[in-house]
């Protein structure tokens, strides 16, 4: 019974400001409890359950703020469990709503940087939307996204490992010509041991399909793969990272210079995204944890 009263109390507290919010009488009727019983329950001294609930709210708010207000209720719930807390994801959802904790939201507009090179030769799609891999360095994806600064556009190129979802290569510059993506893939090659048949997948942008970049990949022993023109799903993993960095960092930060943008994005990638941000596709682990688990298995073998 007390759970129903707690639900009514929480719902009324979070919706009473709205003109169309249900009344206490309506909610009591829906849940099959009496109005008098609800108010009698509400007037009792604070119970141990209520104290635990308030403590849980404090923990949830602390986790939400510690993670830069990026997490929805599922990630907050997983972070709570990892820290030894106990609560259902639905309880976390309800308490976050009561506390008014809303994660940062994406903006609808997106500028495309894909400019197809009409002179590019045929390059196969070796990935076919399968963004999984058995070991780090086997399959990688990359893309470029833009970052506004007071000095004009900055451009971020990334390389993501499909096995760990870790950003293993990145570069920021004031243009998105081929040297930008070359820097990113060279960093990636330094950060992981590439498989003998390693694949790098991208869209059909003119820089990715250029002869200059093809020569770089060939020199690193990497097979090239590209998706179809105009299909974001063919490079969905890279697009997903772009959305995350935009929502969680770029859209919430003002960059006076390209240098400041580079420094801030570097911190996000190396300290936040790779090492502390829980990834749903990894069972709510971090990319670095998955990478380290692979290395530990290799050492034990």
Residue ranges of model-derived segments:
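Charged DNA-binding/catalytic regions of mobile-element recombinases
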Residues: 1-301
């Amino acid at each position: 019974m007390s759970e129903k009263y707690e639900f009514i109390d929480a719902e009324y507290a979070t919706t009473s400001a709205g003109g169309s919010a249900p009344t206490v009488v309506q909610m009591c009727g829906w849940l099959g409890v009496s109005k008098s019983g609800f108010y009698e329950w509400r007037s009792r001294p604070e119970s141990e359950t209520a104290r635990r609930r308030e403590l849980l709210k404090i923990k949830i708010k602390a986790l939400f703020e510690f993670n830069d207000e990026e997490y929805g209720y599922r990630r907050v719930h997983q972070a709570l469990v990892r820290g030894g807390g106990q609560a259902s994801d639905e309880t976390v959802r309800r308490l976050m709503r009561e506390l008014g904790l809303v994660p940062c939201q994406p903006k609808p507009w997106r500028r495309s940087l894909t400019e197809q090179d009409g002179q590019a030769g045929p390059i196969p799609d070796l990935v076919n939307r399968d963004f999984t891999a058995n070991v780090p360095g086997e399959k990688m994806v990359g893309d470029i996204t833009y970052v506004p600064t007071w000095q004009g556009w900055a451009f971020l190129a990334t390389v993501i490992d499909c096995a760990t979802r870790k950003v293993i290569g990145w570069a920021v510059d004031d243009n998105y010509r081929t040297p930008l993506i070359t820097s990113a893939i060279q960093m990636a090659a330094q950060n992981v041991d590439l498989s003998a048949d390693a694949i790098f997948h991208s869209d059909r942008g003119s820089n990715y399909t250029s002869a200059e970049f093809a020569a770089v990949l060939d020199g690193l022993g990497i097979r090239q793969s590209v998706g179809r023109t105009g299909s974001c799903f063919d490079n969905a993993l890279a697009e997903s990272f772009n959305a995350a960095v935009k929502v969680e960092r770029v859209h919430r930060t003002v960059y006076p210079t390209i240098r400041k943008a580079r420094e801030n994005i570097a911190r996000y990638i190396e300290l936040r995204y790779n090492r502390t941000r829980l990834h749903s596709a990894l069972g709510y682990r971090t990319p670095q944890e998955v990478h380290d688990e692979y290395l530990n298995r290799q050492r034990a073998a």
